Amino acid sequence: MLKDGRETGKWIRVMTAHRMNLHLVSDATGETLNSIARATVSQFEHAQIIYHRWSLIRTRFQLHRVLEGIEAEPGPVLSTLIEPGLRSELENFCSRIGIAVVHVLDPVLSLLQHHIGEQAIARPGRQYVLDADYFRRIDAMHFVLAHDDGQAQVGINEADLCLVGVSRSSKTPTSFYLANRGVKAANIPLVPGLPEPPGLEAPIVPVIGLTIDPEALIEIRRHRLKLIGGQPNVQQNTAYVDLESVKAELIWARRLCARKGWPVIDVTRRSIEETAATVLQLVEAWHERRRSLPPGG
């Protein structure tokens, strides 16, 4: 909402926040809706969204609680309900009280049904069945725990990829995010003055470097020192958080990656999700190059 206001004798335009209830109704965990809602709401800088999350809604009794909540706190409804009877009751109720409802999976389901030539089975929570993908994610998580921060380097060639970088360059959170997608990611710290980690001497998996702006890295490291009980006023002049030392450390790591032919991702302004997506693109490119090599090349 825009309002006019006066400041130093001039008219200015002031943007005020718009408050809105948003109901997320799911017959499973609600993870899909949460992701969609976050992605869309993030495009509105001045919105103040009050989320009402309704998960595991699979019976009429459970749905009636939702309808009472929507009536008490009116606002648009996003739904991933599959069962036709529940969908119809939700739609009719929202229509009566003038509330918009969107079944967010419908456009994708319609598209796939048309191209596949098969009707969707309409069963809630199918993405959470304990299938091979589920167990692959669990296996990847165990792998990351065993190979985090340079541990068990002898097993690096069992990984799908290896992340390298200086301390606090987001190797660990990126590895765990990838594990949640079923990707086994080892990660090894690069430390100036120490011998090259043995796991990196002749890796047969893609190795990807992570780097970061020195000022941002120093801020992360200072925060880390606070969390582990360090005293920033004493530690701030050490090499760990000294600007020139950190710059030299990052340059050294970049040169090592360049010498080894490892691609480098700057994570300074990237979310973990964006970094992971770029990592997977680089891994795919690595495999494409390998496939294009002649036998024995």
Curated annotation (Swiss-Prot):
The cross-references to NCBIfam families, in alphabetical order and at most eight, read: PRK05339.1 (NF003742)
What's this protein's name?
Putative pyruvate, phosphate dikinase regulatory protein
Q: Which organism is it from?
A: Granulibacter bethesdensis (strain ATCC BAA-1260 / CGDNIH1)
Under the heading HAMAP family, the entry gives: PDRP (MF_00921)
Task: Please report any disulfide bonds recorded for this protein chain, giving both cysteine positions.
Answer: none
A Pfam cross-reference name: Kinase-PPPase
Alphabetically list the UniProt keywords.
Kinase, Nucleotide-binding, Serine/threonine-protein kinase, Transferase
This enzyme's EC code(s): 2.7.11.32, 2.7.4.27
Family of this protein = Belongs to the pyruvate, phosphate/water dikinase regulatory protein family. PDRP subfamily.
Q: Which residues bind ADP?
A: G165, V166, S167, R168, S169, S170, K171, T172
Q: What is the lineage of its organism?
A: Bacteria, Pseudomonadati, Pseudomonadota, Alphaproteobacteria, Acetobacterales
Q: What does this protein do?
A: Bifunctional serine/threonine kinase and phosphorylase involved in the regulation of the pyruvate, phosphate dikinase (PPDK) by catalyzing its phosphorylation/dephosphorylation.
Which GO molecular function entries does the Swiss-Prot or TrEMBL record give? ADP binding; ATP binding; phosphotransferase activity, phosphate group as acceptor; protein serine/threonine kinase activity
**Coiled-coil regions listed:** none
Known catalytic reactions: N(tele)-phospho-L-histidyl/L-threonyl-[pyruvate, phosphate dikinase] + ADP = N(tele)-phospho-L-histidyl/O-phospho-L-threonyl-[pyruvate, phosphate dikinase] + AMP + H(+); N(tele)-phospho-L-histidyl/O-phospho-L-threonyl-[pyruvate, phosphate dikinase] + phosphate + H(+) = N(tele)-phospho-L-histidyl/L-threonyl-[pyruvate, phosphate dikinase] + diphosphate
